[in-house]
């Protein structure tokens, strides 16, 4: 029996569920294979910050849910960046109990499809430089380090409490193009169907 998943735009009614999902995946006890435990403490996001994301004139947050709409399995935020035809991807999250099912890969593919349809030439993201396994995961999906880095926003409570003084972000980028390798994901996960 398979669990069908759908990807839909988030609404303000979803804020509470998204906050719980993101905080459990990034900082929760028993968090999944990749998290920020040991790097940052406190919540990863809060209702006010997510409400701002959803109220933004441009961009979107996509949610991955079971088809019946009951269970939120993942989310990702997307917004146009300052450069023409560049979109920023952030907060890619999968419920820690559902990781290793191919959901993150599928949601990333849907996010890339979305920005392609918006005319994006590239997708960029920032990742904490010490999250080596996460950076490697993105690199296996075609993202490359640009060589640029950005300072960590020490003192900004919206991102949590830093536990180290050597945090900074690396910038990853992937060109947006349709093709056999970069087109919509053909998932091999046993129990996953994406509409």
Predicted regions and their residues:
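Short, conserved glycine- and acidic-residue-centered signature motifs
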Residues: 82, 104, 165
